[in-house]
């Protein structure tokens, strides 16, 4: 451990090959076999776990502020900075992505070069690999699980938004909220199973708002609906521009436009 350190200060290196290439880098913590083993000049990194941050390597003096805790957590990070990765395999495909937070087993496991994502929960944002900084927030087991290039989505709850692939600017809060939506964008679902079956076969701005337990839970391709109340509009499928306010409001309406 630390076999190459020359003038570096205040490094804590514990484990075979931990911090083994560091020379004059400072303020690093590497605990575990092969943790932070390739970096030479990067400072202010914390790597705890076998092969955590194992390929990170700054060739000029740089404060990385990366934190990786868990087996292979951040194991592919090369020059990405300001990442917090906690959990086995969390963020383990990240290379140059920056300012990501992944907490949970395999959270944000596929994203490589982009940043500004927050994934909290086992396999949250598991398949995300956006083409640019994407500003997604997913909290809950499998939240946003299938998202690939979606951007600016806020997803909170187990299985919430877990079918979204390229949809953007959606808000889904509650277990199974918006759970089958794939391509639809700009919808808000707050409540257990709200907009649970919304699913557009093409990329489209849907502008549905559903607030309440089961609100709009049968909506599939309907757009521009505003549904507020427990079980409100829960039979509506493809109607457009409807407004339902109150418990079970419009609960018998299946189709029809406002």
Where are these regions (language model features)?
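Glycine- and small/polar-enriched repetitive beta-structure motifs of secreted/surface proteins
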Residues: 1-258
